[in-house]
Amino acid sequence: MSQANAATKAYSDVFFNASLEDIDPEIFGAIRNELGRQRHEIELIASENIVSRAVLEAQGSILTNKYAEGYPGKRYYGGCQYVDVVEELAIERAKKLFGAEFANVQPNSGSQMNQAVFLALLQPGDTFMGLDLNSGGHLTHGSPVNMSGKWFNVVSYGVRKDDHLLDMDEVARLARENKPKLILAGGTAYSRIWDWKRFREIADEVGAYLMVDMAHIAGLVAGGQHPSPVPHAHVCTTTTHKSLRGPRGGMILTNDADIAKKINSAVFPGLQGGPLMHVIAGKAVAFAEALKPEFKLYAKNVVDNARALAEELKSHGLDIVSGGTDNHLMLVDLRPKNATGKRAEAALGRANITCNKNGIPFDPEKPFVTSGVRLGTPAGTTRGFGVAEFKEIGSLIAEVLDGLKVANSDEGNAAVEQAVKEKVIALTGRFPMYGYQG
């Protein structure tokens, strides 16, 4: 063997067999540290969850090597016979899980799935309605800083000031006045049940499409804990992570064949090129997991745990927006503790409790300060926390916030936060992740 060939073989051996730790210790170290953070912290960010080892294996598979522009059976590249199997499984499982006639599993994210629907059903300058960001909507539902707010004429609806519930009379009035081409229902920080039937009635009255973004509650819909929008909406979108507990990505569902054709063309070639086949494999695995009876129990536990956490926080003098929760999340009004969301997020983070600052309806604070935090139970429930643990977590949160109130500074109360941190580490140690103890 020549010296050049020997060098090539040696390089190939390293390339195909060396570990991440050997090749890139900096990235390996960052991943190791993140794993440690996840193991030892309580994750209460409502949009986050923990995937199974099976999903991790699928997403980290050699499918990442394959280009597959197009759809199963109609690809622009050869060698797609096996990734076709993967995508077809993902599609069929998604349809079965949500009772839909058509599914597109290629969107790379929640933003891209919503963009694809807009591309399929709207023209620039068209009017659509969406939930105001300050009432619990999403950036892609018409925020002025987002493409959805720049390309279209957006009419936002909101919640009532007295009870923070959706004002369906306002939705109907705005629809009649503005004649939108599309009405978008769904949000990221609304803790009550959505009345899909009423939304469809309003949409039909004004001749609009009804689009539902169920990204946050898809797992609860699949698990029978929230009414499904699929029988009512012209088109539904959802991320595949959050309460659905899959890899990060998006999906679009419809029962209308004509809309399905438009959606497929909008996703590819309209918006994306080659799909991420390793992620689609992870989606397929997550859908299979969600079709099992155990997932229904998981979804029930998510809601039970959220209600327990909300009630515990209320018992410590905190206000919950709308008075409680019917799903996986809640908005906590921090004003009774004289705290802002920014301060509370930082203080809880120092105590190993992860959440995000969040505006509350009619919030007087700036968006990067806020009067509230958003809390969710999907990740903790996946880990095995039950009602007892979430009551304990509620007490720990109150302990940190009370300490913050006494300190009345950005630095917080170091003694209280350290004491809570030790309790959090003890709690998380009883619920190991990925076979890891301690």
From Swiss-Prot:
Q: Which coarse location class applies to the principal site listed for this UniProt protein?
A: cytoplasm
Matches recorded under Gene3D superfamilies: Aspartate Aminotransferase, domain 1 (3.90.1150.10), Type I PLP-dependent aspartate aminotransferase-like (Major domain) (3.40.640.10)
* Record EC number: 2.1.2.1
Q: Which reaction does it catalyse?
A: (6R)-5,10-methylene-5,6,7,8-tetrahydrofolate + glycine + H2O = (6S)-5,6,7,8-tetrahydrofolate + L-serine
Domain of life, per lineage = Bacteria
Cellular component (GO) terms are: cytosol
Q: Where is this site: Plays an important role in substrate specificity?
A: H241
Cofactors needed by this protein, per the record, are: pyridoxal 5'-phosphate
Similarity remark: Belongs to the SHMT family.
Q: Quaternary structure? A: Homodimer.
Function text: Catalyzes the reversible interconversion of serine and glycine with tetrahydrofolate (THF) serving as the one-carbon carrier. This reaction serves as the major source of one-carbon groups required for the biosynthesis of purines, thymidylate, methionine, and other important biomolecules. Also exhibits THF-independent aldolase activity toward beta-hydroxyamino acids, producing glycine and aldehydes, via a retro-aldol mechanism.
Protein name (Swiss-Prot/TrEMBL): Serine hydroxymethyltransferase
